[in-house]
Amino acid sequence: EQLYPSQYVYKYPKAGEKNSEVRLYIYQIEEDKKVACDLGEETDIYIPRIRCNPFDNSLLVYRLNRLQNHLEFLRFDQQNGQSELLYEESNKAYIEIGDYFQFLKTRNAFLFTSEKSGYTHVYLFDGDSRKTVQLTKGNFDITDLNGVDETHQYLYYTSSEESSMERNPYRIGLNGEGKTLLCPEAGWHDVQYSRGFQYFMDRYSYLNHPALYAIRNSSGELIRVLKDNHALINKMKEYELSSMELIQVPNEAGDQ
């Protein structure tokens, strides 16, 4: 907003100084009072995420230790501030906090991402059974969560499963079954779903082809091509440009 850079000052402890202690409160508007949340005896912690559960009006809080290698999901009762441990994971080195998190509207459950398998995957926590189910599995990363169709019990996502140099959209049941590749064309797909997930727009491109825009149904079947950039393709042919190609170089271990 400013034309010139300005100095930003924030508290950061110097060596030997005590870290700031994090406290969490729930403010009850009707009763005009605040309820202290019990974060445990350890005060040298982070609270990287706070979520409000619309299903039971509780508070879900991420608690992360100072070393950032032990993460816990805590449920707080808004009346008394008491906590319940729902989920936890540990790592010898570091835990990356994922930004994707979604409560389901029709059941007491939520979706979140984790790298605990070595890759970014989607997990479902069931609030009734207190069990966590891994929905997506494999040696690839989930790169985008496109939405949840609770009516038909599907999760829509984009991943690098076909190739680390490509992005393809998929859908999978909320029970972890019935995975379907929606757009098999090699390249990069950027999708946007309609309300109700009946259709989606696919913006698709690859190295030697400009962006193509198309409408597909929820199963990935092509409904209509909106723009194929045919004129641009013909124009590019006039310049007789060399074709581009991506290659993978293996190392001694065979990794690429």
Predicted regions and their residues:
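Structured, non-catalytic alpha/beta "coupling" segments that mediate domain-domain communication
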Residues: 70-72, 199-226
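Structural motif
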Residues: 21-23, 68-75, 118-123, 164-170, ...
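Conserved beta-propeller blade repeats
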Residues: 9-23, 38-64, 70-75, 85-113, ...
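Predominantly five- to eight-bladed beta-propeller fold
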Residues: 1-36, 219-234
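Short loop/turn segments that connect beta-strands within beta-propeller blades
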Residues: 28-32, 77-81, 126-130, 173-177, ...
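N-terminal cap/lid segment of alpha/beta-hydrolase-fold proteins
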Residues: 227-256
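Short flexible coil/turn linkers enriched for glycine and charged/polar residues
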Residues: 67, 116, 163-164, 176, ...
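Beta-propeller fold detector
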Residues: 35-38, 83-88, 132-137, 180-184, ...
